[in-house]
């Protein structure tokens, strides 16, 4: 295990004691503390995707090889949030899946347009309270996998298995930018068996703008650039970027209707050209929260 992961794992394991220490002896902060279960989004969306340079390079994994068809996709995005005057601790789960099936000459072909499971725990320490939001260091540890296996260029099937650690600085709880961060990233990729260690840099954001009472623009995204690899694998990304944008229109309660446009682009080590995937569609979603205290 690299020094980065030892430090990151120690930070994550110490989170409960840090939370307790922050609470101990601070009655006013304890009263202001909250524990909330956030269902950020449960949605079913109908979408059409378009992949560029699909026929020119084979060295791309997963949904970058999907067919250009209309499909239904299911999404779940939720977290458990502990928040007080000095820290924010999030434990999150994100899942999405969508696929299409076609039959030609008696042969059925399946194409995945979305397949992702992401578990993360994230600790942010609040240091500076600015007009634009709260700024402080953060650590994040996550595990990314998928529901079904994909077929690689060697003819075998594999399932994405990535442990990803991040450490950096974050702007949190801003008026528009709910999250804006820059971080160093260390990955342990177990997709093809033995760990393939990778080092990268990443910037990302979450943005919200309330257009009117019943309408809100929501956007999130990231850019990740890899610098160091432990092994060579032609499907390893050199860089990866993604932005997801939707216009939430409230219907009733937590139910909303949203047109959306998502775009992701990447280039692998074995490809000559970068490949992009654009998805447009409509979604029906639900969001709510429950405060324990």
PLM feature spans:
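Predominantly the C-terminal beta-signal and adjacent terminal strand-loop region
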Residues: 236-293
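Transmembrane beta-strands of outer-membrane beta-barrel pores
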Residues: 41-52, 84, 95-101, 141-149, ...
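Short loop/turn motifs that connect adjacent beta-strands in outer-membrane beta-barrel proteins
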Residues: 24-36, 81-90, 126-136, 172-180, ...
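Residues on the lipid-exposed face of transmembrane beta-strands in outer-membrane beta-barrel proteins
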Residues: 74-82, 119-125, 143, 165-173, ...
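Outer-membrane beta-barrel transmembrane domain signature
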Residues: 177-250
């Amino acid at each position: 295990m690299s020094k980065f992961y030892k430090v990151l794992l120690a930070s994550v394991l110490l989170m409960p004691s840090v939370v307790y220490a922050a609470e101990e002896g601070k009655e006013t902060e304890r009263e202001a503390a909250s524990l909330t279960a956030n269902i950020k989004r449960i949605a079913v969306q109908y979408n059409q995707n378009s992949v560029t340079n699909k026929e020119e390079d084979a060295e791309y994994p997963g949904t970058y090889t999907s067919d250009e068809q209309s499909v239904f996709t299911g999404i779940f995005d939720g977290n458990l949030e502990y928040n007080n005057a000095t820290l924010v601790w999030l434990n999150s789960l994100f899942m999405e899946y969508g696929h299409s099936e076609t039959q030609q000459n008696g042969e059925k072909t399946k194409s995945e347009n979305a397949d992702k499971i992401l578990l993360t725990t994230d600790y942010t320490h609040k240091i500076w309270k600015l007009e634009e939001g709260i700024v402080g260091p953060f650590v994040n540890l996550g595990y990314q996998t998928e529901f079904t296996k994909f077929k690689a260029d060697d003819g075998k099937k594999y399932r994405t298995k990535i442990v990803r650690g991040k450490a950096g600085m974050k702007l949190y709880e801003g008026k528009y930018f709910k999250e804006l961060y820059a971080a160093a990233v260390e990955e342990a990729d177990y997709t093809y068996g033995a760990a393939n260690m990778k080092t990268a840099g990443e910037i990302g954001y979450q943005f919200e703008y309330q257009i009117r009472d019943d309408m809100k623009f929501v956007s999130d995204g990231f850019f990740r650039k890899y610098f160091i690899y432990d092994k060579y694998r032609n499907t390893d990304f050199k860089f990866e970027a993604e932005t997801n944008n939707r216009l939430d229109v409230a219907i009733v309660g937590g139910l909303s209707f949203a047109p959306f446009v998502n775009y992701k682009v990447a280039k692998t080590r074995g490809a000559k050209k970068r490949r992009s995937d654009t998805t447009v569609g409509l979604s029906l979603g639900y969001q709510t929260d429950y405060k324990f205290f």
